[in-house]
Amino acid sequence: MRNASRRRLSLLLLFIFVNCAPSIALGQDRIRIGVPLFPTVSYPVFIAQEKGFFDKNGLKGEIIRINSEPTTYQALISGDIDATSGAPTGLVQSNIQGVPVVSLGSWDNLVSYTMITREKIDDLAQLRGKKVGINRLGGKSSLVLRVMLEDAGLNTSKDVTLLQLGGSQERLAALIRGGIDAAPVDFAFEPKMKQMGFHLVPGRKTPFMNGPITVTVASLKANRGKWLRFVKAYLEATQYMTTNKEGSIEVLKRIVPADDKETLDHAYEQMRARATVDLIPPEAAVENLVKMMTYVDKRAATVDRSKLADYSILRELAQSKAATKK
């Protein structure tokens, strides 16, 4: 009697497992994504999370804000997170050091900074002979600024004076009192800078791979199906972001420290306009990222570009989409 009861219980548990396992497995397929503390560059990740694109593709996303890129890549390599979004410098640095990580795609491929000035100028080249405030030499913002200025034909060692002033509040204070002539600011805060009486330098944005999705090569090989679903969700979120303003701004309110409509509308329109919807960055954007890294490590100049990215999932999804339309 007891053995028969055990057999019936075993059969019941087997029935429950067989019939419920697929949905449980999908629900438990977790992906932990490391993003910056100020994560506008990871915008599609938040949209995928909050608008159900991860759920739709059988994923449970866990977004983790991390305060520096070195810490982000330490977490990626150790397995504490599964992917990074919007942390480009470690992609090159890791490959220089022989650690195989790759980008699966990048939605944002322009520098995220705008130059603000006390006096109105027409382009960055007119900063020749001027003082520019930065956080610190060697920091990411100063390195990106160097790419921007060199793209405009300026030599940062000779043509401008870079002054280390600390954070944004210190740079703004220096601008107000005339201690510097210009400073970089995140594009999301352009309206506030205008309200304060500063001028925004017009002109084209410098190409720069700013928003890569980065994973370890080992994880990509071992979990390709999961990463295919992740990239699909990311593509869908990016498309949603470019076509659904109201829903996208709902998400943006949670990641941009601003509550006024003008700032939020401006930030959204900027991100919509700069989005690379197919996630494949222009060659110039990749080259400027590599160029930036040569400022801190000369070995970056010889890094194998083919090892920085694997777009095979993007190509597979594009082919599948094209076949469906036929």
Locate the predicted segments by residue.
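Short linear loop/turn motifs
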Residues: 62, 161-163, 208, 266-272, ...
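Predominant activation on well-ordered alpha-helical scaffold segments within soluble catalytic domains
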Residues: 46, 92, 146, 191, ...
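Conserved C-terminal helix/tail region of periplasmic/extracytoplasmic solute-binding proteins
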Residues: 290, 294-326
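Secondary-structure end/capping motifs
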Residues: 223-301
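Pocket-lining segment of extracytoplasmic ligand-binding domains
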Residues: 89-90, 162, 169-257
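Bacterial N-terminal signal peptides
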Residues: 10-22
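N-terminal secretory signal peptides that target proteins for export/translocation
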Residues: 1-6
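Short, glycine-/small- and polar/acidic-enriched structural segments
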Residues: 27-165, 171-177, 181-187, 199-207
